[in-house]
Swiss-Prot record:
Binding-site residues, Ca(2+) 1: 228, 230, 232, 234, 239
Binding site for Ca(2+) 2: 418, 420, 422, 424, 429
SMART domains for the chain: EFh
Region of interest: K/R-ring: 123-126, 256-260
Regions of compositional bias (Acidic residues) in chain numbering: 80-91
PANTHER family named in the record: CALCIUM UPTAKE PROTEIN 1, MITOCHONDRIAL, EF HAND DOMAIN FAMILY A1,A2-RELATED
Annotated keywords: Calcium, Calcium transport, Disulfide bond, Ion transport, Membrane, Metal-binding, Mitochondrion, Mitochondrion inner membrane, Repeat, Transit peptide, Transport
GO molecular function: calcium ion binding; calcium ion sensor activity
Residue ranges of the region described as Polybasic region: 96-107
Entry's family note: Belongs to the MICU1 family. MICU1 subfamily.
Descriptive protein name: Calcium uptake protein 1, mitochondrial
Region (C-helix region): 452-462
Cellular component per GO, a single term: mitochondrial inner membrane
Length: 473
């Protein structure tokens, strides 16, 4: 395709060249301009080809393969899935047999992962939200449940059937009835329970909560100090709106958001009336301290982690080691084959183990909140020549995060990241994957780099053409 377009382009350039060469004046400058145009056309063609290849990289494997190869792939994946879930499907008291994920479901999950990675916040919200409430005035508003919110930021979590982009469960507004259903959406001690009378998440809430989850604690501390003009450690509502507006503009979600008046997903204010009441009281004249806000961030992280834990259907308060491993690797970006292999090895090693409690899981994720300090501490150990074994990890957790990691949690982590089986941690890979897990993938740019590439190409073409036309003396 690019060759066919290239031939007439060259012919046109040749004709223009002959025309320019017929004129004696400024021949050298014109030749430079022609060379610049030729280089620019070549660069655009090559870059377009690379972008086309990148955009269709995932689709090529399914398009170009023959039906026979596709069928064999399906059979192989189904067989692998059956092997992986064989132990989980053993009859147990009070546990429902889990349905096996099929070939079609995997393709749907791949599509939904691309929505999470590259779509605008507006589209992500409209795809994963499941409720549409019609008010007495006839106006409607779309809401997420807490489970929808967790699903929207967790890879490989499939949206329920018949619910997708602009497909919702319709509810007529009845304040008393909906408020009575609040317990279905969140526990009374949950942050989500405080989101309005319904305990549901609006679009403004969604943007605010993703901002809180994707921003390190240190960034909020600095922003609060910048707007705390009198130094008393408190900010009012207007100052806090400025703080969170600046923080939001630095996140990938905030940079990608554009108000959509047609869908109603606009940010008229920084956050909803329910959250303003939560932070500043009913009269909105209260003050918010950095301590109280960081406590809100901690509780939000706790509630989201609890929902993730419960999605694995714990038995007697325990999830399997393989399920814990999948939580750790959910945002790793590891290739599917390698990921499947790592989880299989984990399952074989802990086939008859007792599993992990939520307290053990939460302690490890508290350890991850200090991952930058952990990275520094492990680097000191490495430079000192000490091995990064389980005892070292437990010591770092006690020193840096003030938590106690159980021996069993350390065994599972080392089973995942001890690549050569010598009982020592692969520090570089562990830290890189855990940083991605901590931010839940929300810090990644929500685009494929096309706009940035085109801007760089345009700037390069301008500078190149100028250098050819006006060479330095």
């Amino acid at each position: 395709m690019f060759r066919l377009r290239f031939i007439p382009a060259v012919a046109g350039l040749a004709a223009v060249s002959r025309r320019y060469h017929g004129v004696a004046n400024h021949a050298r400058s014109r030749r430079r301009l022609m060379m610049a145009a030729f280089v620019g056309a070549t660069a655009v063609s090559a870059s377009a080809g690379l972008l086309w290849k990148r955009a269709n990289a995932e689709a090529q494997s399914s398009v170009k393969h023959s039906m026979r190869e596709e069928t064999s792939e399906k059979e192989k994946e189904d067989a692998d899935q059956a092997v992986e879930s064989s132990d989980e499907d053993q009859p147990q008291e009070g546990k429902k047999k889990k349905a096996r994920v099929g070939f079609r479901d995997r393709k749907v999950m791949e599509y939904e992962n691309r929505i999470r990675a590259y779509s605008t916040p507006d589209k992500i919200f409209r795809y994963f939200a499941t409720l549409k409430v019609i008010h007495e005035s006839g106006e409607s508003e779309v809401f997420m449940t807490p489970q929808d919110f967790v699903r929207s930021i967790t890879p490989n979590e499939k949206q329920p059937e018949n619910l997708g982009l602009d497909q919702f469960i319709i509810k007529r507004y009845d304040g008393k009835k909906i408020s009575q259903e609040r317990e279905k959406f969140a526990d009374e001690d949950s942050i989500f329970y405080s989101l309005g009378e319904c305990g549901l998440i609006s679009f403004s809430d969604y943007i605010f909560l993703t901002t809180v989850l994707s921003t390190p604690q240190r960034n909020f501390e600095i922003a609060f100090k910048m707007f705390d003009l009198n130094g008393d450690g408190e900010v009012d509502m207007e100052e806090f709106e400025q703080v969170q507006s600046i923080i939001r503009s630095q996140t990938s979600m905030g940079m990608r958001h554009r108000d959509r008046s047609t869908t109603g997903n606009t940010l008229k204010t920084g956050f909803s009336s329910a959250l303003t009441t939560y932070f500043f009281g009913a009269d909105l004249k209260g003050k918010l301290t950095i301590k109280n806000f960081l406590e809100f961030q901690r509780k939000l992280q706790h509630d989201v982690l609890k929902l993730e834990f419960e999605r694995h259907d714990p038995v007697d308060g325990h999830i399997t080691e393989r399920q814990f491993g999948s939580m750790l690797l959910a945002y790793s970006g590891v290739q599917s084959k390698k990921l499947t292999h790592m989880l299989k090895q984990l399952k074989k090693r802990f086939k008859d183990a007792e599993g992990l409690t939520f307290e053990e899981v939460e302690n490890f994720f508290t350890f991850l909140k200090n991952i930058n300090d952990v990275d520094t501490a492990l680097s000191f150990y490495h430079m000192a020549g000490a091995s990064l074994d389980k005892v070292t990890m437990q010591q770092v957790a006690r020193t840096v995060a003030k938590v106690e990691l159980s021996d069993h949690v350390c065994d599972v982590v080392f089973a995942l990241f001890d690549c050569d089986g010598n009982g020592e941690l692969s520090n570089k890979e562990f830290i890189a994957i855990m940083k991605q897990r901590l931010m839940r993938g929300l810090e990644k740019p929500k685009d494929m780099g096309f706009t940035r590439l085109m801007r760089a190409m345009w700037k390069c073409a301008q500078e190149t053409a100028w250098d050819f036309a006006m060479p330095k003396q």
